[in-house]
Amino acid sequence: MATINFGGVLENVVTREEFSLNKAQEILKNETVAVIGYGVQGPGQALNLKDNGINVIVGQRKGTASWNKAVADGWEEGKSLFEVEEACKQGTIIMNLLSDAGQIQAWEGMKKYLTKGKALYFSHGFGVTFHEKTGIVPPNDIDVFLVAPKGSGASLRSLFLKGQGLNSSYAVFQDATGKAQERALALGIAIGSGYLFETTFQKEVYSDLTGERGVLMGALAGIFEAQYNVLRQRGHSPSEAFNETVEELTQSLMPLVAENGMDWMYANCSTTAQRGALDWKGKFREATEPVLNELYDSVLSGKEAEIVIEANSKPDYREKLQEELAVLQQSEFWQTGAQVRKLRPTK
């Protein structure tokens, strides 16, 4: 492990330098890695493992769009693509990459194949952390761990193809064989992680649920809408309001922040922007911190998990979800966004 100073706090991380791909391949050489679920994370992780020389099979319900995608990606029925239970039977490491709702539904069929010495892998701590609500309690004679890439499966794959990678967290929940940590780290490297930092199942799920409801999606979309609405109410055109709210951020500022940091951005903008941003940053922090604390408490109490499980268990959930998404898609805000994106220069 390498010890890195993160803003004055020392953390141990695992990089490709001290845990090479060759080492990962050696650890996994006798394993059959069964990737269960070919939806959000499944394709990226499975294809990266395959390209890195790991023995991988995919388990997916036949006849679904995800099954068809797996076939299109080169997985062969009966050779590397199987129904879920058959893949679980063959796998020595079962990577449970189904959705949280899907994991609950598939658990009874999956757990009978979790025999002594096998490993159960997650990319999210939801099912195990909220086991009282999900019913997911792994047998005590298997390894249980997670590797959680900090981004989508599509990003994991595209960065891998460029020779890059996403950072990932990892956690060992149960070490029955004495090999759980090396199995977890080997898989973390083999799926294309840039570096791995240690967490726990609980911390992973608490930070993840807070992040996606907060800055990553919920808060971001909410503040987008708020600023757009204010500009429109004050007489600005849809195009101007969208450009000043979203387009400049995503196309100009965030790539620079990603490359250089927000501190660099503050030091390299106009003096007018610089002064205003410094003055208003604290006000936004003070306004949003109580909301984020309320959000974290809701996650910690299990309320957010309960909402998700209850919503996903309703027979008309997908229909209701499409109605909610349609409101977003048909709003002036995002209809304007669609037109703005079409006008981006392509050359």
Put a short name on every predicted segment.
Residues G44, K50-W75:
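NAD(P)-binding Rossmann-fold cofactor-contacting core
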Residues R61-K62, D73-T129, V137-S152:
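Rossmann-like NAD(P)-binding element
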Residues G178-Q233, S239-V257:
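Active-site-proximal catalytic alpha-helix in oxidoreductases
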